[in-house]
């Protein structure tokens, strides 16, 4: 599904088990691919076990291959990493 779709990237923080479950639920509702990149690892964001295999103490990069007509960023807004707010 990564062919002609628009790529959206954002940095997120998942700070609890509930955050991971909520994020994976949002990703699973999407018909397009959603990946999380952490260092050299790329995992399917629809996989709760995959997310838990990552180091969740650091921000994660999310890449969604949507059609450009979607509210994915609005849905994950509460997870978006904003370092200026964490000071």
Where are these regions (language model features)?
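C-terminal structural segments of small proteins and small subunits
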Residues: 59-87
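Amphipathic alpha-helical interaction surfaces in cytosolic regulatory modules
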Residues: 17-33, 41-56
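Short, ordered loop/turn segments at secondary-structure junctions
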Residues: 39-40, 67
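A short, aromatic/hydrophobic, helix- or strand-capping loop or linear motif
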Residues: 36-39, 87
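Short, Lys/Arg-enriched N-terminal segments with co-localized hydrophobic residues
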Residues: 1-6
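Positively charged, low-complexity intrinsically disordered leader regions
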Residues: 7-15
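Short glycine-rich, basic-tinged beta-strand/loop micro-motifs
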Residues: 7, 57-58
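Conserved beta-strand core positions
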Residues: 10, 32-34, 60
């Amino acid at each position: 599904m990564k062919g002609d779709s628009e790529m959206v990237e954002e940095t997120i923080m998942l700070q609890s088990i509930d955050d991971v479950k909520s994020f994976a639920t949002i990703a699973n509702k999407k018909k397009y691919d959603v990946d999380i990149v952490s260092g050299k690892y790329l995992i399917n964001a629809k996989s709760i076990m995959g997310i838990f295999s990552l180091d969740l103490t650091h921000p994660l990069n999310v890449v969604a291959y949507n059609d450009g007509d979607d509210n994915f960023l609005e849905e994950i807004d509460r997870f978006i990493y904003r370092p200026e707010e964490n000071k």
